[in-house]
């Protein structure tokens, strides 16, 4: 399921030729994503290593993890919401086993600054962290 969702976004982004238009698409994705409750914008859910405050919250439902995400910067919000959508509804095991290098196919290194690219890697690490903690049910 993770790979299928990611491939859907890759197809959309690969059909956009202009890098600036890709940038706008990612920001629009964030703008159109559901806002996160202010009560969840706490240090526990903050993604370290992002240039802007960014939050990623896991919700454990039966054997699946669903994510809510937000950021104060539109490009970060777009990326974290896209990542949240790709992984939401997956089992912790599927998340742990998925090769996050698949995200490299988005070629974000040509689109984002090095600092923003580091932020994306931090978002992906946070997802893996939650998948490893799944048995402890650390979140809401």
Which sequence ranges carry the predicted segments?
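Short acidic alpha-helix initiation/capping motifs at coil-to-helix transition points
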Residues: 1-5, 74-78
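A general alpha-helix detector
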Residues: 8-9, 79-82
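Short, hydrophobic/amphipathic alpha-helical patches that form generic packing surfaces
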Residues: 28, 81-85
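Solvent-exposed interaction patches of small proteins and small membrane subunits
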Residues: 44-51, 71, 93-98
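Conserved interaction-surface patches within small, structured recognition/assembly domains
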Residues: 59-75, 84-88
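Glycine-rich phosphate/pyrophosphate-binding loops
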Residues: 89-106
């Amino acid at each position: 399921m993770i790979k299928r969702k990611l491939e859907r976004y890759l197809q959309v982004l690969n059909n956009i030729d202009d890098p600036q238009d890709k940038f706008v698409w990612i920001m629009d994705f964030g703008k159109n994503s559901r806002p996160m409750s202010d009560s969840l914008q706490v240090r526990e859910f903050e993604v370290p290593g992002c240039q802007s405050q960014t939050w990623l919250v896991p919700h454990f439902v039966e054997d699946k993890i669903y994510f809510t995400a937000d950021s104060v910067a539109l490009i970060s919000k777009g990326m974290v919401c896209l990542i949240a959508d790709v992984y939401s509804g997956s089992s912790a095991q599927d998340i742990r086993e998925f090769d996050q290098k698949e995200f490299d196919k988005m070629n974000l290194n040509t689109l984002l600054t090095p600092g923003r690219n580091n932020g994306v890697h931090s978002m992906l690490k946070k997802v893996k962290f939650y998948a490893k903690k799944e048995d402890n049910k650390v979140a809401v």
